[in-house]
UniProtKB/Swiss-Prot annotation:
ATP binds at residues 7-17. This is 7-cyano-7-deazaguanine synthase. Its EC number is 6.3.4.20. It comes from Caldicellulosiruptor bescii (strain ATCC BAA-1888 / DSM 6725 / KCTC 15123 / Z-1320) (Anaerocellum thermophilum). Catalyzes the ATP-dependent conversion of 7-carboxy-7-deazaguanine (CDG) to 7-cyano-7-deazaguanine (preQ(0)).
Amino acid sequence: MRAVVVLSGGMDSTTLLYDVKSQGYEVFAISFLYGQKHSKELEFAKKTCSLLSIPYKIVDISFFAELAPSALTTPDWNVPEGYYTDSTMKQTVVPNRNMVLLSISAAYAISLGAKKLFYGAHAGDHPIYPDCRKEFVEAMKNALYLADYIGLELEAPYVDMKKEDILRRGLELGVNYSLTWSCYKGGQKACGRCGTCTERIEAFKKVGVKDPIEYEIEIDW
């Protein structure tokens, strides 16, 4: 059975890619260039797909940055530092992003005759990103199932999982986390201060494993 995975190049979606492949699906991956400052994540997504021999497509919707300003896409907005629970992190919300990405991904999945579409929303995203909440996932499941004759099924298997639990699952699957990128700033090295870096570092610490990527700051693992 064919399945499409929405792949950002970060920890969660990369783990999901390995996970779906391990279940015996014929996997296709899709990523989006939506004007994000951290577009280098797509370089890592491409490398992972090459490693796993998974067909990979990048869809350029850079125009979206003009329609939906955010600290992730607008050049003169600074990426906030801290934790996802901080109110300043709302600046990183790209309005309606996941609904747009999932809709395009669904069209791609339907064109392939895929029965399932996977994306990596997880419990740590819930406080700040409305389009990663369980209620949103359920609503999109219904909408996408009804949107075409094929009855496409949307799956978000990590929606109730913490990031450290996703990491544990990834380590079981042999995920190469050196080929993942999380930092919102998109520099040469991960900043170690933005919300996604902070969450990633905490996950590795909780699991008791050193993150294989480089950071701009010194981290006591």
